[in-house]
Amino acid sequence: MKKLSGAEMVVQSLRDEGVEYVFGYPGGAVLDIYDAIHTLGGIEHILVRHEQAAVHMADGYARSTGKVGCVLVTSGPGATNAITGILTAYTDSVPMVIISGQVMSNLIGSDAFQECDMLGISRPVVKHSFIVKKAEDIPSTLKKAFYIASTGRPGPVVVDIPKDTVNPNFKYPYEYPEYVELRSYNPTVNGHKGQIKKALKALLVAKKPILFVGGGAITAECSEQLIQFAQRLNLPVTSSLMGLGAYPSTDKQFLGMLGMHGTLEANTAMHESDLILGIGVRFDDRTTNNLEKYCPNAKVIHIDIDPTSISKNVPVAIPIVGNAKNVLEEFLGLLNEEGLKSQTDLESWWQEINQWKAKKCLEFDRTSGVIKPQQVVEAVYRLTKGQAYVASDVGQHQMFAALHYPFDEPRHWINSGGAGTMGFGFPAALGVKLAHPEGTVVCVTGDGSIQMNIQELSTATQYGIPVVIICLNNHFLGMVKQWQDLIYSGRHSQTYMNSLPDFAKLAESYGHVGIKIATPDELESKLQEAFSIKNKLVFVDINVDESEHVYPMQIRGGAMNEMILSKPQEETN
């Protein structure tokens, strides 16, 4: 059995776990680990310019692959800088292991230089956390961390490692565990057969059923089963922001995204339904609006691997705890074995839905003479043939991308849904591109969000990571401005940004390509130019209509079907 120092154990454990990339930033408490990375090799380290960006890069890598992202930061400010990224991963159930350095064990609690209680600070935003007390525990602790992060409902796990446990002068026998035994942690992956049969029977007699798909369906890798099931029973399908791509957005049975900025047909169908089958969803406030008015005639069936999510916000008639893929396979098996089929004709239900679809709630003014954000997203969709990985920041541009770029595959839509973290999109896009070097990766951002982590242009230069940044520049914090327009009588308090840099020239100063677009006439040709450049990052700064709002938009405190539509529809209704 070979002997390794604690620092070497960290690196060798990551290698044995199959880690490809570590995203991080060195500092005193982790210098021995960084030296081991240099000495042992076998792992590519990406040196970021801020620890928050390291977590977002690992996040993008994880979301687009289903693998566990890995982060390495030093103690104190290195660890605390990572917290926002950890929160982002936690709220969206992203598998990640964050290794944080810690001061010497005998100095913990003494207010030592760069000491902070990482376990205490991170506890509310992690799935689990560990502190390593002796070097011999490093392999088993990391094995547990990766297992916990990737199983059940995934999430970030922090491993805090005091500096003395990675001392290079002491060697210990090394063996990486083949498996993990955690008696207190045993996620339920197979749904209860009685509940599954009960749910299927309820679904088959429903007159207005609808499938509501969330991010948990993507985590469960159940798209194939979901498509078979929905098409077998001719069921309408809608999705949360996080679930986009789990079911093909261009399929005729897909009603679009639901929720605050969901489509008319999706939100109205939910409100009018008599049965909702929720698959890997949280029923959070952005998808339910006023809970007291929520879908008054609907019985709810909820499939989720996390039992604490069931009936947390919406009362559930038939709960099913389990992996969505396994449960859907059980559904399909019952349909085949027992020859079950829908006992109701859904033709009249589809006629209602098609009437709502006919209103074309996503239409907008295409003749105004200024560039509309929707036009940009539609052009990006055409030019990428719908095959791009799209990493979005947070704001109006996020909603425009979700509504106007149809995703037909899972893990191609990368965004911060639960935390709504500005500054997420660009570093996440870099992580996605590292995971998919042959894929087209687009970052859709705004002039506000991009400045949150714009320093990562330097990281992209150092490692030659060619993504296309589409910056919808309206010189405002657009989503906040929209609320100020609609709710605060147009009082734009602290949302106008009058000191923006020349983004194109800034990108060029880092060695990238900068492109400016100011008029609709040049939009298509300059975007074509941007996507024709393959080996360099391209920053496309696009001046868009500053007065444009995201529609549809639910009325605050209303029911699912109470919505403000875009102006063209308001004029025709």
From Swiss-Prot:
Pathway noted in the entry = Amino-acid biosynthesis; L-isoleucine biosynthesis; L-isoleucine from 2-oxobutanoate: step 1/4; Amino-acid biosynthesis; L-valine biosynthesis; L-valine from pyruvate: step 1/4
Cofactor(s) required for function per UniProt: Mg(2+); thiamine diphosphate
Question: Coiled-coil regions in this chain?
Answer: none
The biological processes this protein is annotated with in GO are:
isoleucine biosynthetic process; L-valine biosynthetic process
Q: Look up keyword Ribonucleoprotein and say if it applies.
A: no
Keywords in alphabetical order: Amino-acid biosynthesis, Branched-chain amino acid biosynthesis, FAD, Flavoprotein, Magnesium, Metal-binding, Thiamine pyrophosphate, Transferase
What residues form the membrane-spanning segments? Answer: none
Q: Which residues bind Mg(2+)?
A: D447, N474
Q: What GO CC annotations are associated with the protein?
A: acetolactate synthase complex
Which sites bind FAD? 153, 261-282, 304-323
Enzyme Commission number(s) of this protein: 2.2.1.6
Annotated binding of thiamine diphosphate, by residue: E51
Q: Entry cofactor note text? A: Binds 1 Mg(2+) ion per subunit. Binds 1 thiamine pyrophosphate per subunit.
Any idea which GO molecular function terms this record carries? Answer: acetolactate synthase activity; flavin adenine dinucleotide binding; magnesium ion binding; thiamine pyrophosphate binding
Annotated region Thiamine pyrophosphate binding: where?
A: 396-476
Q: List the Gene3D superfamilies.
A: 3.40.50.970, TPP-binding domain
Q: Which reaction does it catalyse?
A: 2 pyruvate + H(+) = (2S)-2-acetolactate + CO2
Disulphide bridges: none
Entry similarity comment: Belongs to the TPP enzyme family.
- Miscellaneous information on this protein: Contains 1 molecule of FAD per monomer. The role of this cofactor is not clear considering that the reaction does not involve redox chemistry.
Task: Note the subunit structure.
Answer: Dimer of large and small chains.
The protein in question is named Acetolactate synthase large subunit
